[in-house]
Structures are given as C-alpha cells and as structure tokens.
C-alpha cells in the first residue's frame, strides 16, 4: 500500500521519530549539525513563537526546514548522510514504509518504529532492522 503524505505530515513523522529513536545512535548514526546551525534555527523558532517551550527535536526540524537538510554521520561507514524533505517524501511513499507510518499515526509506535522511519528517510529502506 502506498501512502501519500503532505510535507507537514512528513515533518511530523520525522519529528516524532527523532523524539523516539535512540536506536540509530546504537547503529553508529549520529546527528551532525554545527553549533551555529543549531543556534540559528533556535533563534528563528524563538522569534516566531517566543512563548513556546522548545525541545531539541523542534530545533532539528527547523534546521531541516531552514537549510533543506538535516545532516547525519555514519561513524562505522565514515560517511556523511542527510535527510532532505524531498527525499523523505519520496522514500516514505515506498510500500516498506507503510506499516511503520500507520503504526506511528495510530499510536502503536516505539523506538523500533521511529528508527525504521528515519532509516527509510535516510537510506530509502530499513537497513539496521
């Protein structure tokens, strides 16, 4: 089954997955933003919504929205990786993603679901299981 998602739905899935997926770090995949990128994204969010409490994931999504990509690094493969909104929208339409998307949208998700969604956004498939 192919699921067609809006840009906002894709960003929400990525946000929720970032909140719940510590498993990528266990696979050697780490976020790789700079302090400057983080500070600029946080400043933009605080300017837009000064009364809103921010979490790390809000800022990471703002980096993705503002710069067009969220950088990662594969410490084992020594490779730069990234999520782009366009690539995530394309990859999340693959049949393999459907089960994980539905689990998250229905509240039946966990760290494994979140990791699978991020892997699909980055690699186009679940790599680490």
Regions picked out by a protein language model, each given a short descriptive name:
Residues 71-72, 128:
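A structural signal for short, well-ordered beta-strand segments and their strand-loop junctions
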Residues 18, 23-29, 87-95, 100, ...:
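Motif-centric detector for short Cys/His coordination patterns
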Residues 7-11, 38, 56-57, 81, ...:
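Short amphipathic alpha-helical segments that mediate assembly, nucleic-acid/protein binding
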């Amino acid at each position: 089954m192919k699921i067609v998602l809006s840009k906002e739905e894709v960003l929400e899935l990525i946000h929720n997955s970032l909140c719940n997926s510590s498993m990528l770090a266990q696979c050697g995949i780490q976020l790789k933003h700079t302090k400057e990128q983080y500070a600029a994204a946080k400043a933009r969010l605080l300017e837009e919504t000064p009364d809103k409490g921010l979490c790390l994931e809000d800022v990471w999504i703002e980096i993705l929205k503002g710069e067009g990509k969220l950088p990662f690094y594969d410490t084992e493969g020594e490779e730069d990786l990234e999520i782009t909104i366009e690539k995530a929208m394309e990859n999340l339409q693959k049949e393999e993603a459907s089960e994980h998307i539905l689990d998250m949208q229905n509240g039946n998700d966990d760290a494994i679901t979140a990791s699978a969604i991020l892997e699909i956004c980055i690699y186009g498939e679940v790599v680490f299981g």
